[in-house]
Regions:
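ATP/Mg2+ or Mg2+-diphosphate-binding catalytic cores
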Residues: 30-33, 37-42, 215, 296-307, ...
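ATP-binding pocket architecture of kinase catalytic cores
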Residues: 66-243, 256-259
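Catalytic-loop of the protein kinase fold
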Residues: 243-245, 250
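C-lobe/activation-segment region of protein kinase-like
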Residues: 278-289
């Protein structure tokens, strides 16, 4: 399950106090197992312990209380708890953020549906055990999965501590093979053909995120406007729609000791669309040992043994049979989208989402937006 996600910036001064999950950029301080915060048995933020205990015992086979709920730190995204029963059985509970009111942005039923459907595919996911939308049980809907043992690699130190160089190599290969498996899922067979619109994915994404940029920008940044216009003009013809994870990267996968992906995490923004959007985003997040730097530093995949970006792309092309001649377009799109997302985070923090802060303390956010926009433009220009 996803743990604490702490953005690493060019300036590290705010690293301990700023947590970002929209999505996270860079790396996370932490080790291979999720960071948890133990809660008093009868006082767990976001969980009505008595009512949820009753639900567990009546809805989940073999579940017996009392239960211990440990918060797995998760920033501003859906909250995740490790739940341990009296018999030692472990589960994972997911619910929307505290104070959350917009159901469409954190649709637990939709996320549960995706995870449950993918159990009948070649994609490794945690077992989906139950979903509850009854307000009499909790103040917000939640769903429960089985607990999966594995490593969530969030920084280079964790990669070197838990994976051998050979396992790092295999992790890169397994992450690509798993992504290809996601994109190969037969939508009708698993019942997800109506998960989203099939056509026009990139155009819709450009409209959505450019609207967000213009609504929240803190200053003019010509590169964002230029890249938007050029991307809109150059959209490649989309093939058949597939599942698009939307935030596919190393630390949204759990891997075993040998590097094999044992579960893909964080399906909350999954939809249908152009699979190459996932490929482009993985290229942005991934910096192999001999790759040029990304727009941010500290990638876990710089550790010796991990494959480089070109090797990932070659493996995906072989596994999927897809033409990657337009991959720079999708890499540029990924950088541009992340610039728009980070600008929104920066704007909210400038507006007091962290409390009163010195704007200079938040300057690293601005620098990351600038860097991502510059990378988007440079990558697009490489297409000629």
């Amino acid at each position: 399950v996803d743990g604490a996600v702490t953005s690493r910036h060019p300036g590290e001064g705010i690293r301990s106090s700023v947590r970002v999950r929209e999505p996270a950029i860079g790396t996370v301080g932490g080790v291979s197992t999720p960071e948890t915060t133990p809660a008093a048995p009868d006082a767990v933020p976001g969980v009505d312990v008595a009512a949820v205990t009753n639900w567990f015992e009546s809805s989940i086979d073999g579940a017996h209380g009392p239960f211990r709920f440990d918060v797995i730190a998760g920033g501003h995204s859906n909250l995740t708890y490790r739940v341990t029963g009296a018999n030692g059985a472990r589960y994972v509970l997911r619910r929307p953020p505290l104070g959350h009111r917009l159901a469409s942005a954190h649709d637990m039923g939709r996320e549960h549906r995706i995870v449950h459907a993918l159990q009948h595919s070649a994609v490794p996911v945690a077992p989906a055990l139950g979903y509850c939308a009854d307000p009499a049980v909790n103040d917000a809907p939640f769903y429960v999965m089985g607990f999966v043992d594995g490593h969530v690699i969030r920084d280079r130190a964790a990669a070197e501590a838990v994976l051998s160089p050979a396992a790092r190599r295999h992790a890169g290969e397994s992450i690509v093979d798993t992504m290809a498996a996601i994109h190969a899922v037969d939508l009708d067979t698993v019942g997800l053909a109506d998960l989203g619109k099939h056509e026009g994915y990139i155009a819709r994404q450009l409209k959505r995120w450019y609207g967000q940029w213009n609504a929240q920008k803190t200053r003019e940044l010509t590169a964002v406007d230029t890249v938007h216009d050029e991307l809109l003009r150059r959209i490649p013809e989309q093939g058949p729609a597939t599942i698009v994870h939307g935030d596919y990267r190393l630390d949204n996968c759990m891997v075993g000791d040998d590097g094999t992906v044992v579960a893909v995490l964080d399906w909350e923004i999954c939809t249908l669309g152009d699979p190459l959007a996932d490929v482009g985003l993985l290229q942005v997040y991934w910096t192999g040992p001999d790759d040029d730097a990304s727009a941010w530093t500290g990638s876990a995949t710089t550790a010796p043994g991990f494959p480089n970006r070109a090797e990932l792309a070659e493996r995906y092309a072989a596994a999927s049979g897809r033409d990657l001649s337009q991959l720079p377009f999708y890499v540029s799109f990924a950088y541009w989208k992340l610039a728009c997302i980070l600008e929104g985070v920066y704007a909210r923090y400038l507006g007091g989402a962290l409390g009163q802060r010195d704007p200079a303390e938040l300057e690293p956010f601005k620098l990351q937006v600038d860097g991502a926009a510059a990378k988007a433009l440079a990558t697009l220009e490489s297409l000629g």
